[in-house]
Design a protein with these regions (language model features):
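Catalytic alpha/beta core domains of metabolic enzymes, predominantly
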Residues: 124-128, 139-207
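Structural motif
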Residues: 1, 34, 95, 152-155, ...
Length: 207
């Protein structure tokens, strides 16, 4: 898939909470503030949004309400990763069915997959959905990191459009851009690295 989901600043939203559950009025205000402020894409239920600790029902309501509210003004991307491939597929399908423009899928954590295993995991998820998939590489949290060669393999899949690269390695960003070409976007996953990553040819930042 040659067209990037977005260029610029994608913000991983917090999930506002009250003692009784999700604070949807606060989430609505947050979404409107970001759109008015020029944020280029909104990311729901990812690390910052505590997606790993939300229930399936909570996730579904967040996605449905947010997609309806945004109404196509900016891309809505949903964190759907899991260390269980079947769960990542199910979460990704549910997000796409609810109207998400794309999914953000973290490398499987805890199990420490091989590079071949990572390719098989992301390929299985990408095969199961009809929307763009962004790989999320954050080895400080997952214990495993993709290589540039792995990205080059994944970039051949029509649904895998890029990576949120949060390894902290400029060398990996540069090598990935060199190997994968213009059809595979690299977003910095570290706010402090966004300018240098963009200067190297990156698509922006997701943070």
């Amino acid at each position: 898939m040659s067209q990037s989901l977005f260029r610029g600043s994608g913000v991983a939203l917090v999930t506002p909470m009250t003692p009784d559950g999700i604070d949807f009025p606060a989430l609505e205000q947050l979404i409107e503030w970001h759109i008015a402020s020029g944020t280029d894409a909104l990311i729901l239920c990812a690390t910052t949004g505590e997606g790993a600790t939300l229930t399936y029902a909570e996730r579904a309501e967040i996605i449905e309400r947010s997609v309806r509210q945004v109404n196509g003004r900016v891309p809505v991307i949903v964190g759907t990763g899991s260390n269980n491939t079947a769960s990542a597929i199910a979460l990704s399908r549910e997000a796409c069915a609810a109207g998400a423009d794309g999914v953000l899928v973290v490398t499987p954590y805890y199990n420490k997959a091989t590079q071949r295993g990572l390719v098989r995991h992301f390929t299985a998820v990408a095969d199961a959905v009809d929307r763009p998939l962004i790989v999320y590489n954050v080895p400080s949290r997952t214990g495993v990191s993709c290589t540039a060669e792995t990205y080059a393999v994944l970039a051949q899949h029509p649904n895998i459009v890029g990576v949120k690269e949060a390894s902290g390695s400029f060398a990996l960003i540069q090598e990935t851009l060199n190997l994968c070409g213009d059809g595979f976007s690299v977003w910095s996953g570290n706010g402090s690295m966004r300018y240098t990553a963009s200067a190297l040819g990156g698509a922006g930042v997701i943070s």
